Structures are given as C-alpha cells and as structure tokens.
C-alpha cells in the first residue's frame, strides 16, 4: 500500500514541496532565509491578528488604543513589540535573501526572481502602512511625506495624492484605509509566496557552486527540515532578545508623541529598513527625479538577469565580482546611515556619492567585471 502522503491530493502537495523534494546536497545556510521569511510572515500575521482585536483605526483613539494594548491587555506589550521587531527581522531576512540571490546568480530563474521583486514591493508597502497605524508623530509625518511624493507624477499627481488621502491631508479616512490595506496585504503576500515557491519548484534550487546539481540531490526531509529548524531557533532567539531587552532600539522616540499636524518633527525619517532608499530619494534635488530614483533603487533588480554577462552563474569562483558585491553591501550600509542623518554638509555629499556608486556598481561595474573575468579564464 502506497503511503497516504504520496496519494492524498493535499498531502501530496505538501510532500512534494517539503518532504520528498529533491534538493541540492551542498546548499549553505544562505538558503535558510526562504523558510525564515515564511516563519516571519506567519508570526506577523498571528501577532497582527491579536493586535487588530484591540486596535481602533480612528485618529482620536488610535494612539490610545496602542497604549491600552501595552498597558491593559494581557501580554499585549509582548505582542506589540514582537510585531514591531518582527518587521525588522522580516526585512533583515529579506535583504539577506535578495543578497544571496545576487551573489549566487539565483536571478537566472527569472519567473521566481520577478515574483520575488513583486513580493519585496508588497512587503514594503505593508510595512509602510503598518508604521502609520500607531498614529504617533513619525507615523503621521512619515505618511504625509511619503504619500506626497506621488504628487511629483505629472498631470495626475495632486489628484492622485488627494484620492489616496481621502481628503486634503492625512486624516481619519487615510488611517482607516491604511488599516484595511495593512490587514489584507499579508494574505496577498502569502499567496504570492506560494506562487514564488511554485516557480522555484519548476526549476529546483540553485546551489553555491552554480553548477547543475541533478546528479547529486537529497530529500528535503530530514536533512533540510532540521537545518531550517536550527535557523528558526536563531531567528526566534534574536527576535526575543530584541523584544525583551531593547524593544525600542530600532524604533523612533518621536512615535511616542501623539500625531500633531501643527508640529513638524525636526527630522522626518522612515523605519531603518527604508533608510537606504530614503537616502537615494533625498540625494536628488529634483522631486520627480528623486521619486524615480527611489523606485529604480528596487526595480533595478528586475534588469539584473539582463546584465548577467559572466559565463559562470554565481560569484563563488569570481573574486573581482565578490569584491564588487561586498562594496555594494558597504555602500547600502552607508546609504542606510545617511538616510538617518539630517540634510546638511557633509551628509548630502556622502549620500549623493553613495547613490551614484550604488547604480554604477549594478549597471556598469558588475557587467564589465564579468566580461573581464571571462577573458581571464581564457589565459
């Protein structure tokens, strides 16, 4: 008699995705981030659900309802901080996952890669709207500044911004719709993640060497299930250390001041995980140019497969490309730092140089380096 997991319609899908899935035998810990992102998503949906039970999306009571969750709801404080810091862990895993894809040439699976980019945009939109909900000073002014960027779109910009706001400024209508979208989008992310996996399982996983691994595959369970559990333990340990010892480390103190349209905070900035894009936005004096650069800073990932000029897939055996990759990482860390600094000398210049370097590495230096490395191989 055949095992039920191989015959039952539902169990068969799970079996082919997580149990009997043929997996390359040499994938490293960098391949753990996919499962960690799944855990982050589940954690965010669960903590978010419990927060939504006590939260009110009205400008007069939103801030108080968050305070009520932290003070009066049983274990409300831990749920709130797990949700806030869970978002930070989510983005750490996301950026590691994308970085892994860039380093090892996983972007050659174009369908999987493109769905991944859509996922990244959706998660960023979800996180942005979530940051508005506590209705603190940074929530209000962050929402005002970022939504206002759409007014740079020629002809329809102003009307579009007012349509999104539901009025002439960020107000009650904006908060209510942001809460509705923030609630529904994680489920859209879940569906997209399923499609992401579907496309991945059409081709099978990449591996560190970049060489086809059809001749050397092992079952996902128990080898990689146990490895994923270890990764999950590290993730939960890091998250709980953040939540229990320094829950406000990554947040902004201004968000503990209730939103006040009459008082602008000295430095308006988004959460740390958007600072690199915010720095690129601020580097360009022109409003429309800044918005385009902001969108392109993420959308540039979509043309990476077209710029792949190397004869090898990953960077494992390409030392010059490796140096460029880590220069890109250092550049992104510099941009993140600049995004959190006030707009004054020398930060403006550093930000502009880092922004130029970011696009230059991806669009010019990496393709040229790959061609040079191809020629070195001939010697």
Curated annotation (Swiss-Prot):
It holds the Pfam family Cytochrome_B. Binds 2 heme b groups non-covalently. One of its GO terms (biological process) is mitochondrial electron transport, ubiquinol to cytochrome c. Its cofactor is heme b. It comes from the Eukaryota. CDD domains: cytochrome_b_C (cd00290), Cytochrome_b_N (cd00284). It is found in: Mitochondrion inner membrane. The chain crosses the membrane at residues 33-53, 77-98, 113-133, 178-198, 226-246, 288-308, 320-340, 347-367. Keywords: Electron transport, Heme, Iron, Membrane, Metal-binding, Mitochondrion, Mitochondrion inner membrane, Respiratory chain, Transmembrane, Transmembrane helix, Transport, Ubiquinone. The cytochrome bc1 complex contains 11 subunits: 3 respiratory subunits (MT-CYB, CYC1 and UQCRFS1), 2 core proteins (UQCRC1 and UQCRC2) and 6 low-molecular weight proteins (UQCRH/QCR6, UQCRB/QCR7, UQCRQ/QCR8, UQCR10/QCR9, UQCR11/QCR10 and a cleavage product of UQCRFS1). This cytochrome bc1 complex then forms a dimer. Belongs to the cytochrome b family. This is Cytochrome b. The gene is MT-CYB.
């Amino acid at each position: 008699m055949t095992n039920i997991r191989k015959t039952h319609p539902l169990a068969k899908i799970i079996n082919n995705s997580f149990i009997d899935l043929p997996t390359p035998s040499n994938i490293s810990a960098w391949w753990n981030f996919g499962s960690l992102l799944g855990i982050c998503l589940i954690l965010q949906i669960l903590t978010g659900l419990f927060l939504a039970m006590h939260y009110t999306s009205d400008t007069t009571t939103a801030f108080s309802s968050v305070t009520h969750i932290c003070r009066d709801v049983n274990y409300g404080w831990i749920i709130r901080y797990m949700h806030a810091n869970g978002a930070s862990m989510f983005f750490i895993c996301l950026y590691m996952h994308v970085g892994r894809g860039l380093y090892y040439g996983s972007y050659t699976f174009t369908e999987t890669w493109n769905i991944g980019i859509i996922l990244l945009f959706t998660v960023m939109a979800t996180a942005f709207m979530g940051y508005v909900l506590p209705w603190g000073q940074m929530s209000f002014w962050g929402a005002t500044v970022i939504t206002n960027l759409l007014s740079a779109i020629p002809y329809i910009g102003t009307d579009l911004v007012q349509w999104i706001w539901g009025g002439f400024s960020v107000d009650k209508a904006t908060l209510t719709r942001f809460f509705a979208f923030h609630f529904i989008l994680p489920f859209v992310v879940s569906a997209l993640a399923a499609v992401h996996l579907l496309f991945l399982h059409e081709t099978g996983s990449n591996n560190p060497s970049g060489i086809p691994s059809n001749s050397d595959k092992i079952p996902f369970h128990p080898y990689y299930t146990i490895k994923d559990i270890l990764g999950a333990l590290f993730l939960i340990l890091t998250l709980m250390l953040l939540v229990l010892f320094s829950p406000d480390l990554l947040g902004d103190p201004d968000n503990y001041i209730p939103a006040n349209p009459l008082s602008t905070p000295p430095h308006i900035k988004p959460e740390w995980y958007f600072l690199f894009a915010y720095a690129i936005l601020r580097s360009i004096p022109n409003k429309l140019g800044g918005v385009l650069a902001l969108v392109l800073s993420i959308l540039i990932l979509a043309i990476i497969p077209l710029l792949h000029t190397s004869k090898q897939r990953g960077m494992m055996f390409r030392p010059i490309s490796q140096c460029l990759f880590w220069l890109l990482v250092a550049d992104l860390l510099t941009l993140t730092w600049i995004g959190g600094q006030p707009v004054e000398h020398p930060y403006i210049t550093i930000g502009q140089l880092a922004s130029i370097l970011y696009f230059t590495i991806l669009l010019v230096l990496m393709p040229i380096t790959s061609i040079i490395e191809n020629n070195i191989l001939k010697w």
